[in-house]
């Protein structure tokens, strides 16, 4: 997968400005509710987004027209013809046509008019399909039984259209007429089952045939810790007849070859118990038992509108060793989430065992101590019919780099095992690379660590007896995830998960779904609710998310107020987790309380709730005053006990009184550089906010030195000690305590690579990258850096390289967006700046000329250039 991600990060080839009479191209990248051609959405008024295409610079959309129809050729907009709508909006356009029906496929296309009122061609036709809007439309009943369930049915002919609606808990695999349907694994996504159960819609038209058909479902316990199935098939026949098949007491069930399955402990599979043909018509199920009707979970059925978990890559081992006779250790060379596919041939009943771990002992044997109670072991009993047998677990996953193979009949080969990388299939959308190899490896480790921990919820780790949606981890690496992957549908679902656990008193929980940890959440953990809501608005311009979760975020903030005393929030469980130096918990909690109130005020202002915006602004100001009175030492001029985090947090949110800011910042800088020899002592919160703070205050060189540090504690120290993902602790620990070696909560650094080193930043005043700020930090010995990001509006990219006499910067801005490009003068004077060979700054003045460039000015050693959409190649040099 990393290779796929890496190709996204390329140096931009500058293009000459397009001719002014260039015509607009047809829109691309059509999305419905963030998804491409989704099958099964249950939003009555879905939103449409598209990417504008235009060869000319400085272009924008002035109007659009959307057609929606039941006809795939879209000869008319029978469902909705928006007409020509004068608007620059190309994201989150709300459907406003005839009411949508359940279980229906709709086709849509869009065109737009550019700044010259020239119409583009229509886009290619996209589609979306609705799920079931009304609970009464579910005719299938919840049934239970053993882990294999089947049903046969007859069709008079071949259907013209057929769909399966499936909710299977904890996990399921759907099979029709002997073959698996779809490529999802570990489906459905984990939710709070008492509130919400997700179902998936499958197009099974080509799987059904005239005559007898069979549907089979394998069930695993997953996070539900039981097995339950609700399914219905709706087939439309020629002539308009319909056939419905739904779960009820007539379905048959029998235990299958999966003898045990556990997320933590692994899977036990006895191939001797396979019953060939059980998922085909004509199978003799006379000895199978009738499935039992059950109440099922209490939660409402909801469409799974997010990227599913899939096998996204296959990795061959790097090497195989034999530390003891009969014990074979395979090294993948990379810490992953997933399972192993094994090929084996041998006597019937032979027991083969696969154990998984992140670490080895010095003697080369498997070290499973840090897995704690998780056994992470898959066991396979051979069928023994003389053929080659292939085994891959279905209802578990592991976090591992090493696999121990024992009990194998004969001598295994190098290719006996292959690893399958398994996680939520979020599309890579970003890339970063630079001239500094340690940064590139850290970026690689961050990307692997995040993707390994996206398993329908953002987890803390992927290997031990935990793997929870810890809320602090979720919000701390969220921005990095958004810069590297296509995350909006994933986080939309997770915000619903948070809403599902919220109690009437406003409290949320440390983990979501809630299986472990406290209620109420630690304030720093509860920050996931306001921050993820806010990030969805900033990165994707999603106002509907603000509308949906404003009351919930406000309720959480109101709860914090009930726990505060004179503006100070004293309760704290974790605070700035896993630091080198501990910061007082009440300082961290009060910081979070202030930020929650501040965000509620900002959200209220955006939503037109002026009274609440003013009220929560006043509340935030009162908290800030109390914070400074409590924690700022007037004698020493530092906060709390003087830790780095205690200074970082108030500096980051501009809570420090103006006359004290310089002193607090100076104390922080002195501690970093002199006291700690350019090392940090922060935990996960302080680390997240340190790097943007240093950049904002003109200390990017120091941030770079910290980021490239290779001695303890640092990311480079992890790399130097063989890490291929991020550790839970700064220390390199391998014992049975808290020491995961795949824990992305320190991955917040990755956002700084994009924001500072590549210089790609959003402007909250124009969210969703409608306005972009390109501000690369040209630091120390870094010779070049490049970053690219597929935003909801199109590609934003920035690539720079420097020489002794200047700087080259290449920039891409999406059609419909504008940008402020900040080019550091690097102490050169006087400077000239050209774009595609034409001067735009000379003799201290802006020189008009190139298309798309609308102005330039000089500010504090930086040339600030205003541009519209397009690709630009800037060259700065000394005159």
Residue ranges and their predicted role:
Residues 4-14:
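Bacterial N-terminal signal peptides
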Residues 20-105, 109-464, 472-473, 489-490, ...:
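Extracellular/oxidizing-compartment recognition motifs
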Residues 162-166, 176, 339-358, 392-395, ...:
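Alpha-helical support elements that line or immediately flank enzyme active sites
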Residues 171, 230, 248-250, 254, ...:
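Active-site acid/base region of carbohydrate-active enzymes
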Residues 172, 180-183, 187-188, 498, ...:
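Active/binding-pocket-proximal capping segment
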Residues 232-234, 246-277, 304-313, 701-879:
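Non-catalytic C-terminal accessory modules of carbohydrate-active enzymes
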Residues 269-270, 465-466, 471, 484, ...:
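C-terminal capping/lid segments that line or modulate ligand- or cofactor-binding pockets
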